């Protein structure tokens, strides 16, 4: 008797689960109709029986899977389509390698700080013809994520037909999505940037902040881009995520002497040896500033931010309240993303981010 009851109970459980699935799907379906009635008003599936309800679930779910990409393309505005396409590529890249998030943020910074946000850093060198920014000392064997931007560009082309978006725009979106993916505050990214038909090798050397820069040099470089001291300290907070090459940060003159023991690098430095920039390198948090206040910032250029009363005050503000830092960082990134290309630059919307278009469109 007990055996039969247990089987009956099991059978009733399966029936209950099936009915619950039908009810949930029906409620979801009705919610979709409420939201998109004009699209679905002629669809009226029959849920009167368990058999037809379960069959409808299986059929509609299979159709939904096959048609999801097409449906999204039809429903999204052109701008939203671009954001969705880029975000999917960025999320996938960071899921595969968390470090990539910091790399994409840095790539956007290194693009904008050299002659404005013009995608110049993405241009490959051409032997004997063109030397760009990728192999300049601040970027050589260091800047990375080019392939992610290329994938995002192709995804936009495939997913959002008849939408023209620059590679500089894609860099800006990818950086924003990386910040959010790693736990930072998201922020708005306006589209409309253009891509330069050239790059500036020497500009990367002269305009980008370096790990050995003292505070005076850093202030001048940020002032040249119209950033305040507070914005400079906020943007330095990008070092709350990511790694740097040991040969860059764990060498005399670049590393903060007080943090020398934190450099987890081998005695023989190679470009493949990496040093995390704070103690939580995959989380967009305030630990970078906590480390600075404890005199444990890794890079010399970071630790000197505590050597001046004004900048040290901002470091303390951010160490005391992560939300203040996240808000200021987001605002500074928006401002940085608006840095214009050099006056007179020849501009276009590149078809492929790593090379200029075969024939230039008129200057934009």
Swiss-Prot record:
Marked site: Transition state stabilizer: 106
Keywords (A to Z) from UniProt: Calcium, Disulfide bond, Glycoprotein, Heme, Hydrogen peroxide, Iron, Metal-binding, Oxidoreductase, Peroxidase, Secreted, Signal
Major enzyme class: oxidoreductase
Binding site for substrate: 209
Residues noted as binding heme b in the record, renumbered to the chain: 239
Residues reported to bind Ca(2+) 1: 111, 114, 116, 118
UniProt-listed GO biological process terms: hydrogen peroxide catabolic process; response to oxidative stress
Location in or out of the cell: Secreted
Main localisation: secreted
EC number: 1.11.1.7
Pfam families, sorted: peroxidase (PF00141)
Catalytic site: 110 (proton acceptor)
Residues binding Ca(2+) 2, per UniProt: 240, 278, 280, 285
Top-rank taxon: Eukaryota
Gene Ontology MF annotations: heme binding; lactoperoxidase activity; metal ion binding
Cofactor requirement: Ca(2+); heme b
Paired cysteines (S-S): 81-160, 112-117, 167-353, 246-265
Catalytic activity field: 2 a phenolic donor + H2O2 = 2 a phenolic radical donor + 2 H2O
Signal peptide: 1-25
Cofactor note text: Binds 2 calcium ions per subunit.
Family the entry assigns: Belongs to the peroxidase family. Classical plant (class III) peroxidase subfamily.
Name listed for the protein in its UniProt record: Suberization-associated anionic peroxidase 1
Protein source organism: Solanum lycopersicum
């Amino acid at each position: 008797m007990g055996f039969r009851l247990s089987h009956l109970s099991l059978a009733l459980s399966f029936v209950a689960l099936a009915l619950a699935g039908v009810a949930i799907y029906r409620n979801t379906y009705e919610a979709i109709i409420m939201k998109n009635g004009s699209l679905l008003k002629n669809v009226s599936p029959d849920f009167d029986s368990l058999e037809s309800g379960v069959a409808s679930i299986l059929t509609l779910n299979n159709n939904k899977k096959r048609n999801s990409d097409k449906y999204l393309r039809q429903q999204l505005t052109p701008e939203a389509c671009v954001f969705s396409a880029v975000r999917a590529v960025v999320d996938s890249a960071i899921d595969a390698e968390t470090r990539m998030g910091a790399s994409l943020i840095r790539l956007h910074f290194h693009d904008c700080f050299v002659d404005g946000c013009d995608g110049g850093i993405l241009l490959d060198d051409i032997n004997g013809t063109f030397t760009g920014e990728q192999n300049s000392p601040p970027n050589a064997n260091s800047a990375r994520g080019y392939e992610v931007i290329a994938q995002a560009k192709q995804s936009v082309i495939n997913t959002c037909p008849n939408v023209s978006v620059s590679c500089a725009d894609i860099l800006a979106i990818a950086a924003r999505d990386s910040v959010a993916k790693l736990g930072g505050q998201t922020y708005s990214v306006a589209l409309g940037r253009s891509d330069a038909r050239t790059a500036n090798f020497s500009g990367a050397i002269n305009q980008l902040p370096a790990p050995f820069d003292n505070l005076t040099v850093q202030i001048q470089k940020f002032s040249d881009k119209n950033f305040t001291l507070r914005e400079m300290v906020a943007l330095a907070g990008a070092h709350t995520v990511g790694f740097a090459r040991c040969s860059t940060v764990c060498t005399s003159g670049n590393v903060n002497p007080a943090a020398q023991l934190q450099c987890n690098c081998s005695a023989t430095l190679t470009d493949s040896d990496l040093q995390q920039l704070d103690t939580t390198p995959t989380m967009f948090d305030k630990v970078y500033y906590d480390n600075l206040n404890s005199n444990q910032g890794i890079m010399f250029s970071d630790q000197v931010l505590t050597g001046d009363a004004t900048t040290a005050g901002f470091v303390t503000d951010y160490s005391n309240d992560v939300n203040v830092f996240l808000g200021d960082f987001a605002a500074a990134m928006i401002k940085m993303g608006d840095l214009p290309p050099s006056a007179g630059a020849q501009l276009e919307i590149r078809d492929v981010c790593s090379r200029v278009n075969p024939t230039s469109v008129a200057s934009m």
